[in-house]
């Protein structure tokens, strides 16, 4: 029985640093004298992990940026693997960032070191056969969604549903009034939150259409306030430029620095790009309209090659197995269509109440004390040695 395991953790993104810190805290309840090294950020360091590289050094997005930084990323991977192997870890845990982590995990597994991948890639959405490659890299997968372990089971891979950390963080009942006060919004006016994505390409595709829809909505809802949280500093100039050309009343439109959760909390309804933000809006119990649009050539390739295996895109709909919220994709993503769907949310409170009850059921399903369950699954794996 291992009393003081050596645990290596790699968090390739800021969200992974957050997950890693919670995991370390829970693992210490199982192994008080455990040692932790890895790649992480401030939160993992505060939890007691000695980081050899910072998470920010791995955080690159987009093909061109990855290619530009590839020599540096390969050097980090090479140096980490060599140094970590010499440290003799009992287990290596990769958190999300599959492009980097799965290769490292496989390298360690081939050297008979236990490996765990925390946060499954979206194999339920596309390229399910990746599960076999993941299984060749890890001894156990820790999944955030309940539909994931059955897919891995078809490939004979040990996968555990641990719940979603965001469902643990967000309370079942949320406080709209406090959020509005924090943002300086009137308590009784209608409020729409607009989230067209976190990447430049997403905002280029969706931003103008979203703002046009919000402008049309304001004609139906006098006094409507629109809050637009910029996901990061890189996005804000583009959003500001799009907002300046929109028909939204200047006094009632609010471009924010980040604050996405506060913006959604303050809102009556959310207009959001398909992605993780839809899950957050669901957990905050906000009715939403979900939209997405990619370049026409990309969409044709995906459809022709049948790369996607889902017919729903919004996470609330995928989790529910039914159409809880409107989805407007590609040619259906027009300002009039978005405006009509948003207006329906504002005008039918009885529908909103039923929707929020369904949200609560899904929230309960996802709230599992993820860090605790993840630590238990890793501790169990360590005791099998």
UniProtKB/Swiss-Prot annotation:
GO terms for cellular component: membrane. It is an enzyme of class 2 (transferase). Pathway: Bacterial outer membrane biogenesis; LPS lipid A biosynthesis. Keywords: Glycosyltransferase, Lipid A biosynthesis, Lipid biosynthesis, Lipid metabolism, Transferase. Signal peptide: none annotated. InterPro entries: Glyco_trans_19 (IPR003835). Its EC number is 2.4.1.182. Belongs to the LpxB family. This is Lipid-A-disaccharide synthase. The gene is lpxB.
């Amino acid at each position: 029985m291992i009393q003081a395991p050596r645990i290596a953790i790699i968090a390739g993104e800021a969200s992974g640093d957050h997950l890693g810190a919670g995991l370390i805290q829970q693992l210490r309840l199982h192994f008080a004298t455990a040692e932790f090294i890895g790649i992480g950020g401030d939160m993992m360091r505060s939890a007691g992990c000695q980081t050899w590289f910072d998470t920010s050094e791995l955080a690159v997005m987009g093909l061109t940026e990855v290619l530009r930084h590839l020599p540096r990323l390969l050097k980090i991977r090479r140096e980490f693997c060599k140094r970590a192997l010499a440290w003799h870890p009992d287990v290596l845990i990769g958190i999300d960032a599959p492009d980097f982590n799965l290769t490292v995990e496989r390298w360690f597994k081939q050297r008979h070191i236990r490996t765990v991948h925390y946060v499954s890639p979206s194999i339920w959405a596309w390229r399910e056969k990746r599960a076999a490659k993941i299984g060749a890299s890890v001894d156990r997968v820790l999944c955030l969604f309940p539909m994931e372990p059955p897919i891995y089971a078809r490939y004979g891979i040990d996968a555990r549903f641990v719940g979603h950390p965001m469902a643990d963080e967000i309370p079942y009942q949320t406080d709209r009034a406090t959020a509005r006060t924090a943002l300086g919004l009137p308590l009784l006016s209608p409020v729409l939150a607009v989230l067209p994505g976190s990447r430049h390409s997403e905002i280029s595709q969706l931003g103008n259409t979203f703002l046009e829809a919000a402008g049309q909505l304001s004609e139906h809802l006098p006094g409507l306030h629109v809050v637009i949280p910029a996901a990061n500093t890189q996005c804000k100039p583009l959003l500001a430029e799009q907002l300046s050309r929109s028909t939204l009343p200047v006094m009632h439109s609010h471009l924010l620095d980040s604050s996405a959760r506060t913006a959604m909390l303050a809102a009556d309804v959310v207009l959001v790009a398909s992605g993780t933000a839809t899950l957050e809006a669901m957990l905050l119990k906000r009715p939403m309209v979900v939209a997405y649009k990619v370049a026409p050539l990309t969409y044709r390739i995906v459809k022709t090659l049948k790369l996607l295996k889902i017919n729903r895109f919004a996470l609330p709909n995928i989790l529910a197995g039914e159409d809880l919220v409107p989805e407007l994709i590609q040619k259906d993503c027009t300002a009039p269509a978005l405006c009509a769907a948003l207006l329906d949310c504002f005008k039918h409170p009885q529908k909103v109440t039923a929707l929020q009850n369904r949200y609560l059921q899904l929230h309960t399903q996802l709230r599992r004390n993820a860090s605790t369950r993840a630590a238990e699954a890793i501790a169990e794996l360590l005791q099998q040695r």
